[in-house]
Amino acid sequence: VTGAALVGLAAPSVASPTDPVVHFSPTLTRAMPGGGDCAAIINAETVPQPQAGTFGVRLKITQTGERCGAYRVAVRWRNLDTGIENGQSHRVTGTVIDAKDNIITGFGTAPGVGRVEAHIVTTTEDHRDMEHLSGDATFTLR
């Protein structure tokens, strides 16, 4: 089973970035809530946004197993130049992100211009980290 989502971070800037698409290392997660025998591979890549200092993340989730419960996928980031850090998570049921058409945008927060370190992680619905190997990427936003 596979699905795709777009995770977007928005900021009130008017510049248009020319940021390249950057691929995260794969996120691997297992022992999904629900008592099932489940595992997922989450592939992700950045998606340039029209506002400077912002980025989106497109996710593709491949899940296998039985009795897989709902969980959350989180994008956690840190601006290495300013030290600002934040993130956002969204509910996943199977491979469906909790958003219209599997597209998530408009977090209302962004790392700003500079070098950014970001991680894709999985958590339970009450935001406790699940067993996972995070997907990581470092990139520069203009």
Residue ranges and their predicted role:
Residues 1-15:
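Secretory targeting and sorting signals
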Residues 73-138:
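Extracytosolic low-complexity repeat regions of secreted or lipid-anchored proteins
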Residues 24-26, 135, 141:
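Generic structural "secondary-structure junction" signal
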Residues 11-13, 34, 114:
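Generic detector of short, well-ordered, non-transmembrane alpha-helical segments enriched
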Residues 6, 48-50, 66-68, 109, ...:
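Sterically constrained small-residue positions within well-ordered secondary structures
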Residues 21-74:
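Short, surface-exposed binding/anchoring microloops in extracellular/periplasmic proteins
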Residues 44, 139-140:
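Solvent-exposed beta-strand/loop surfaces, strongest in extracytoplasmic domains of secreted
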